[in-house]
Amino acid sequence: MDAAAWDKKYEETELVWGAPPNELLVEYATALPHGQALDLACGEGRNALWLATRGWEVTGIDYSAVAIEKARTIAARSPRSVLDRLDYRCGDVTVAEYASRNGQGYDLALLLYLHLPAPQRTLVVNRAINSLKPDGIPMILGHDRSNIDYGVGGPKDPEILYTPEELMQEFQGRLEFEIAGNPHRHTETGIAVDALVIGRKSGVGNAKNG
């Protein structure tokens, strides 16, 4: 889908993905000390807003100008202290500037349900890793390729889906993996099969802008 198609999707529904944050993000990040976070394909900002309410400073980037405007409108209902921690930007995550607000890199990068052809996915994940501080955490979550046959919802094009094993093989050496698997998600129409990888940036050195 191009930006115009995403704009149309966000215009037609009040909240495309709902208001609550992603359950796996909440489960994992609740125990983390707050810092700088990057949310790629942030949509209407449900995850970015949740992080900001917990003290994180969050940069959210999305292709859809409509989604970003909705994210800003929703955030405006929050206390000033929360609103000031949010920086929403409209842009294509394959080329957009990732620089953190303090210029020192991110502690956490979210790539949640960001489905791209493999070459673009590799580019974006590498850029996200580059933007992290040493020991920073990328969280990659999406529809597993097996969901086409064994789950419900999500894209039906296998070229934009992936498995945890593929991600681990591709990014070994760049990440030290903490969690990898296929969580099952209950939906109104059945069970969806997801792919989840969480790791830490390997090696030392300064974070880059991506």
Q: Over which residues does each language-model region extend?
A:
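Conserved SAM-binding strand-loop segment of SAM-dependent methyltransferases
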Residues: 80-94
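Conserved class I S-adenosyl-L-methionine
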Residues: 1-32
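Conserved SAM-binding motif I beta-strand of class I
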Residues: 57-62
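Conserved SAM/SAH-binding beta-strand->alpha-helix loop
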Residues: 64-66
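A short acidic, Gly/Pro-enriched loop at the edge of an enzyme's catalytic core
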Residues: 98-108
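A short SAM/SAH-binding and catalytic strip from SAM-dependent methyltransferases
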Residues: 106-121
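Conserved beta-strand signature within the Rossmann-like core of class I S-adenosyl-L-methionine
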Residues: 135-143
